[in-house]
Amino acid sequence: MRKPTALIILDGFGLREETYGNAVAQAKKPNFDRYWNKFPHTTLTACGEAVGLPEGQMGNSEVGHLNIGAGRIVYQSLTRVNVAIREGEFDKNETFQNAIKHVKEKGTALHLFGLLSDGGVHSHIDHMFALLRLAAKEGVEKVYIHAFLDGRDVGPQTAKGYIDATNAVIKETGVGQFATIAGRYYSMDRDKRWDRVEKCYRAMVYGEGPTYKNAYECVEDSYANGIYDEFVLPSVIVNEDETPVATINDDDAVIFYNFRPDRAIQIARVFTNEDFREFDRGEKVPHIPEFVCMTHFSETVNGYVAFKPVNLDNTLGEVVSQAGLKQLRIAETEKYPHVTFFFSGGREAEFPGEERILINSPKVATYDLKPEMSIYEVTDALVNEIENDKHDVIILNFANCDMVGHSGMMEPTIKAVEATDECLGKVVEAILAKDGVAIITADHGNADEELTPDGAPMTAHTTNPVPFIVTKKDVELREGGILGDIAPTMLTLLGVEQPKEMTGKTIIK
């Protein structure tokens, strides 16, 4: 008989004392409550820098499963760059230094592309400010900003504030000028609407498009015409004599400071692909020997990468596999990539000895219409596997508290919590019957806050702590744990040595 060690992830199941708007607290959950009272338990931090996100930022399922599976803090691109700036490594970055050295030797210009906002989804304006300060420190004279306006990850009419903030840094450093302005609708298309990208290219390279004396004027004119940040037409900033402040020319350098690839790829390809055929670039195709991307955008972009991908070696799945143990990953469609691809550190392929079970999520318009989703089918499939003694390690995700929690509706979310509790009981009892151990936890909160203080639906994740229960009476747990400590704890329970790459610490004292 195998004694399975199971990790049960109750997706979106956070903890907070206030019961108002709290579906987790209001639901009847006798199984969870019993395990919480009977077995060693603590809470874990699942948001902010503890999971590699900026301080105070709510966690999410991708980040949560990455951290849990990796057994370490996995810094997301935004935080990675922030930490590099804070610790002084940003200015030493070899890729940035090469671009700066190039323009100084050639007497050419440095162009900064990117989304001008602090939304933190695709870019952060602080990273552009760090580049302006670096250029000033290194004595680069010609620095031009090609600002992509946001209006999507931030308010629809916030561009002026970001322009003001940029002008303050330009004044502080004595470096930088706005050269073009374009809404992200044009500059950051990802759906092959190349006519949009072409308008940007022609503004940046040929100085074609509406012209303005400064960035502020461009935004004000757009607003007057009912066009807000995201949709501002690619426009050119001109000097007193109506010539463009700057166009992009041979031997210039570009630093594209967006860190999220999907909406950066198309415009980067226009500048880096010699055989680009999506539209006619015209007679002027500037040769840019130093085109720097903040992160790895795509194999189709021929640029240098400032922050190269971090390979996650020796994740929990890999270590368990190398120890010769059999593992099962099981979830319904909505969370299947999380227990497989993300849990394995961004790896698609199965490890030796790994089996996967995918249960289809129900086909409904929104999950508040079916709060139980496919949890009963997932549970039946898993209990059958446990009874057949097939696996040493089980990774299970119950999706309901998160997927229904996103509705911001109390009644369906309470039902989702109650269905989750019912199935949690079935799975844990099957594991205990085999003399196994379950770890019950979550990747982030959601169902714990369904209403704002004024009664409006709250559809986002929360920053509340998540539960951590080990169904084994003879262990003691420490406080202050994070998601990256879960894999080392599982290895402790399995009696498998923790690899050096896993920098998390076991929660078992």
Swiss-Prot record:
The lineage of its organism: Bacteria, Bacillati, Bacillota, Bacilli, Bacillales. Substrate binds at residues 122, 152-153, 184, 190, 260-263, 335. It comes from Bacillus cytotoxicus (strain DSM 22905 / CIP 110041 / 391-98 / NVH 391-98). The gene is gpmI. Its cofactor is Mn(2+). GO terms for biological process: glucose catabolic process; glycolytic process; sporulation resulting in formation of a cellular spore. The keyword Phosphoprotein applies. The active site is at residue 61. Monomer. GO terms for molecular function: manganese ion binding; phosphoglycerate mutase activity. This is 2,3-bisphosphoglycerate-independent phosphoglycerate mutase.
